[in-house]
From Swiss-Prot:
Organism, scientific name: Candida albicans (strain WO-1)
Active site location: 190 (proton acceptor)
PROSITE patterns the record matches: MAPK (PS01351), PROTEIN_KINASE_ATP (PS00107), PROTEIN_KINASE_DOM (PS50011), PROTEIN_KINASE_ST (PS00108)
Domain note: The TXY motif contains the threonine and tyrosine residues whose phosphorylation activates the MAP kinases.
SMART domains attached to this UniProt entry: S_TKc
Modified residues annotated as Phosphothreonine in this record: 226
Cofactor field: Mg(2+)
Keywords tagged on the record: ATP-binding, Cell cycle, Cell division, Kinase, Mitosis, Nucleotide-binding, Phosphoprotein, Serine/threonine-protein kinase, Transferase
Record family assignment: Belongs to the protein kinase superfamily. CMGC Ser/Thr protein kinase family. MAP kinase subfamily.
Sites of Phosphotyrosine modification: 228
Protein name per UniProt: Extracellular signal-regulated kinase 1
Domain Protein kinase: 66-369
Enzyme Commission number: 2.7.11.24
Length: 415
């Protein structure tokens, strides 16, 4: 073999090696691409959503008809993601709930699911669809597909001063939803700014029915408080003073607290604890008169009220008044004047004695809301059946497995 032939063989060998390396690289790239595609497919199948503030991933095992966008909310027992329903290109919210670790979460989920299916109202959040599990064995999480609302009243109050027009419209829509709920014999029991969802059109929808109950007879109220964890700042005084009977007036009180917060930009009664909460209320409303005092059925609660120093009522017009020389706007969130009609409605919403508090129907007729009030466009709802909340009456006997079966049955029913 001469040198030329040797070089020729070497060149051929090198070319073969280069070809093999190129093939190997191409195979590796193809393999990596396949892995990436598989990972992307898995991510799409699981609809994994990651918050910008956190590196953790939350898997959403939903139909590939939905493209998950981002996490928009996180609560005590659920995570909400925005998504696009691909066939219709509609933006939706998907709420993922994993309730099966605690019976209380199962109960809350069951209440919410049943009530949202019952109501069909413009100012109550609705369920568009439910992701149904393949079978009972694979039923470990719940996915509710709902209307997407951009924000909530809590966020809005924190970031801007609301105009009087906005306040009127938000209170009107809240009361309009309450009229439907109360006509169905349902108490929400947890109304607060973060449970009032809003979109860019200023449409308002009440959400979170996990603490809701039927307007029950006195004996059915036994155990009413056992799970009462509603935000203290919006709780009616009769709840803390253990009145024998709870009525629609507890929701009306919460509306009053929300109205006051919109007017001032901050909570009206931000109690540190049970005692401080009552004291803050009495500092504004004054010590109850004899009639209201004896309306409190609990002797222990009456004795507690009696032990507190006497308070004189402060009219809301005085509480929210700005000084003319602009040295203080602390009670009005920078607002230069407040509509006197708003304060008049507030006086009627925040009355200590629930029997004297304005009703939702009368609040809707109040002059402050006359721009929006239309009795022909404030629908009522069908009353819930008597056995609607039967599971609540038996909750001490129901295991998590029992509640899981009830939830599965509810989810598998048509909407």
């Amino acid at each position: 073999m001469n040198i030329d032939q040797h070089h020729q063989l070497q060149q051929q060998h090198q070319q073969q090696m280069l070809q093999q390396q190129a093939q190997a690289q191409a195979q590796a790239q193809a393999q990596a691409q396949q892995q990436q595609q598989a990972a992307a497919a898995a991510a799409a199948a699981n609809a994994a959503a990651t918050t910008s503030s956190s590196p953790r991933q939350v898997s959403f095992n939903v139909s590939d008809h939905y493209q998950i966008l981002e996490i928009v909310g996180e609560g005590a027992y659920g995570i909400v993601c925005s998504a696009i329903h691909k066939p219709s290109q509609q933006k939706v919210a998907i709420k993922k709930i994993e309730p099966f670790e605690r019976s209380m979460l199962c109960l809350r989920t069951l209440r919410e699911l049943k009530l949202l299916k019952h109501f069909n109202h413009e100012n109550i959040i609705s369920i568009l669809a439910i992701q149904r599990p393949i079978n009972y064995e694979s039923f470990n999480e719940i996915y509710l597909i709902q209307e997407l609302m951009e924000t909530d009243l809590h966020r809005v109050i924190r970031t801007q001063n609301l105009s009087d027009d906005h306040i009127q419209y938000f209170i009107y829509q809240t009361l309009r939803a309450l009229k439907a709920m109360h006509s169905a014999n349902v108490l929400h029991r947890d109304l607060k700014p973060s449970n009032l969802l809003l979109n860019s059109n200023c449409d308002l929808k009440i959400c979170d029915f996990g603490l809701a109950r039927s307007i029950a007879s006195q004996e059915d109220n036994y155990g009413f408080m056992t799970e009462y964890v509603a935000t203290r700042w919006y709780r009616a005084p009769e709840i803390m003073l253990t009145f024998q009977e709870y009525t629609t007036a507890i929701d009306v009180w919460s509306v009053g607290c929300i109205l006051a917060e919109m007017l001032s930009g901050r909570p009206l009664f931000p109690g540190r604890d049970y005692h401080n909460q009552l004291w803050l209320i009495m500092e504004v409303l004054g010590t109850p008169n004899m009639e209201d005092y004896y309306n409190i059925k609990s002797k222990r609660a009456r004795e507690y009220i009696r032990s507190l120093p006497f308070c004189k009522k402060i009219p809301f017009s005085e509480l929210f008044a700005n000084t003319n020389n602009n040295t203080s706007t602390s009670n009005t969130g920078g607002r230069t004047n407040i509509n006197p009609l708003a304060l008049d409605l507030l006086e009627k919403l925040l009355i200590f004695n629930p029997a004297k508090r304005i009703t939702v129907e009368d609040a809707l007729k109040h002059p402050y809301l006359q721009l929006y009030h239309d009795p022909n466009d404030e629908p009522i709802s069908d009353k819930i059946p008597e056995d609607f909340f039967d599971f609540d009456k038996m909750k001490d006997q129901l295991t998590i497995e029992d509640l899981k079966k009830l939830l599965y049955e509810e989810i598998m029913k048509p909407l």
